[in-house]
Amino acid sequence: MSRFKLTLEYDGSNYAGWQRQAKLHTIQGALEQAIFRFSGQQLTITTAGRTDAGVHATGQVAHVDFIKNWPPHTVRDALNALLRQQSEAISILNVENVPDDFDARFSAIKRHYLFKILNRRSPPALNAKRVWWIPKPLNAQAMHEAAQKLVGQHDFTTFRSAHCQAKSPIRTLERLDIQKEGEEIFIYAKARSFLHHQIRSFAGSLMEVGIGRWTAQDLEAALHAKDRKRCGVVAPPSGLYLTKVEY
């Protein structure tokens, strides 16, 4: 068996998330279909991050084991051709051989996410499924300053889904920066791992700061409350991107 590491991007708008589900269109299902057509093997592809329905990726990482040691460029080009035939919004950016002990999920040491907000009065006509449109003016500087209250090791119970299956709500957030570029506001997050809906919960709560409804102290109080009910609105998946995985 030969293990291959795949780096890929996808538009998650029309998928029911990464994880294979019966009768639903998923990223994993589409990839495994292409892999079967290429290799004749019924294989399971393992990913660094099982993104939710509607979430995108520009730097997702996965691994798969083939019986044959194909040249990496052959795997990339063949899978991309098959994905195009299947009309999938998925592209394999890079393929490389890796040792058998490499695991796309468990070998990862950092995950980077980006959340995009379109902040203008007019709604988006072109990228409606790739941003969170907020027509009210946002104070990006206030959002950035408040976000620093969340950086570090904390119990993030307030900012995780009630359905989160993680054993512990404690995570170490290494970066949470907010930058404004023209009509867009970008939220950059980095950690070894994240809780279910954590970044979308951050984005929704920071929106409350941006419109002036919350202060930085309100955000900090919500964090320390360790109470899901204290979270702001959960932002939609359309603005969220997995951008990079470090190993």
From Swiss-Prot:
Q: Which GO annotations describe the biological process of this protein?
A: tRNA pseudouridine synthesis
Q: What class of enzyme is it?
A: isomerase
The active site lies at: 52
For this protein, the record's Gene3D superfamilies field holds:
Pseudouridine synthase I, catalytic domain, C-terminal subdomain, Pseudouridine synthase I, catalytic domain, N-terminal subdomain
Q: Which reaction does it catalyse?
A: uridine(38/39/40) in tRNA = pseudouridine(38/39/40) in tRNA
Enzyme Commission numbers on file: 5.4.99.12
Q: Look up keyword tRNA processing and say if it applies.
A: yes
Keywords for this protein:
Isomerase, tRNA processing
Which GO terms label this protein's molecular function in UniProt? RNA binding; tRNA pseudouridine(38-40) synthase activity
SUPFAM superfamilies attached here? Pseudouridine synthase
Q: Which domain of life is it from?
A: Bacteria
Q: Name one Pfam family in it.
A: PseudoU_synth_1
Residues that coordinate or bind substrate: 113
Role description: Formation of pseudouridine at positions 38, 39 and 40 in the anticodon stem and loop of transfer RNAs.
Family (UniProt): Belongs to the tRNA pseudouridine synthase TruA family.
Subunit notes for this chain?
Homodimer.
What's the protein name?
tRNA pseudouridine synthase A
